[in-house]
């Protein structure tokens, strides 16, 4: 049986990573909206549905950014 070393949970850059993820998701929404005029009706519906899910993800990531920033401020992330 092999022994695995436990790596400490380094969350020091979570806020920055989440901010990058939000920005990338926003860019994906913008790019997909540019493609709407070239898409069939079925594809347009799929794009709209996917963008709705993307917006929900953005909201969740922003909530997590807030939580991580608060934790950092309170000294949990040094």
Swiss-Prot record:
Region Disordered, residue ranges: 32-78
Name listed for the protein in its UniProt record: Small, acid-soluble spore protein Tlp
Keyword Coiled coil: no
Keywords: Sporulation
InterPro entries: SASP_thioredoxin-like
Regulation: induction: Expressed only in the forespore compartment of sporulating cells.
Domain of life: Bacteria
Similarity field: Belongs to the Tlp family.
The organism of origin for this protein: Bacillus licheniformis (strain ATCC 14580 / DSM 13 / JCM 2505 / CCUG 7422 / NBRC 12200 / NCIMB 9375 / NCTC 10341 / NRRL NRS-1264 / Gibson 46)
Chief place where the protein resides: other
Basic and acidic residues biased stretches: 45-78
HAMAP family linked: Tlp
GO BP terms: asexual sporulation; sporulation resulting in formation of a cellular spore
Organism taxonomic ancestry: Bacteria, Bacillati, Bacillota, Bacilli, Bacillales
Compartments, as annotated in UniProt: Spore core
